[in-house]
Amino acid sequence: VFEEIEKPIISVVEKMNKMGIKVDKKILKDLSLKYHQELARLKTVIWEEAGEEFNINSPKVLSLILFNKLNLGDKRQKKTPTGAISTRESELEKLRDKHPIIGMILEYRELSKLLSTYIDAIPPQLDKNYRLHSTFILAGAATGRMASNSHNLQNIPNKTVLGRAIRTAFM
């Protein structure tokens, strides 16, 4: 396996690591503007639905709004170790049809994550040629497949339309 498969690809992987991947900074800048605007819009609408301004990013505060003020939970909802009703994505998905605020909160979280982890985080990490460098590791995973770290390019989202838009910046 090493002689026939892994050895011939070592030089290719080294070249990939050294060269990096070209990133279209303008696409990320445009996405940043668009997603920040949508985040601000969602925040306003969520506050309107809740009837008050609150920290959407605080699970504790969000739990109070959703389950105490809006009475959206039931006894089957999972609780956190502190006894608060969980606001994890999997728990909120179960409530999506109960109130429009749930879908808005899930979208708000997705946008916030994409902005902080990818869209706004990648540009400062680009080299002078607008390339992002990663370290690809042959047989880096337990299954034998290649792994990537120090900018894990295998983690760029692809399950949602919002996430897939980020991939268009990679050339």
Where are these regions (language model features)?
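Conserved "right-hand" nucleotidyltransferase catalytic core of DNA-directed polymerases
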Residues: 1-162, 171
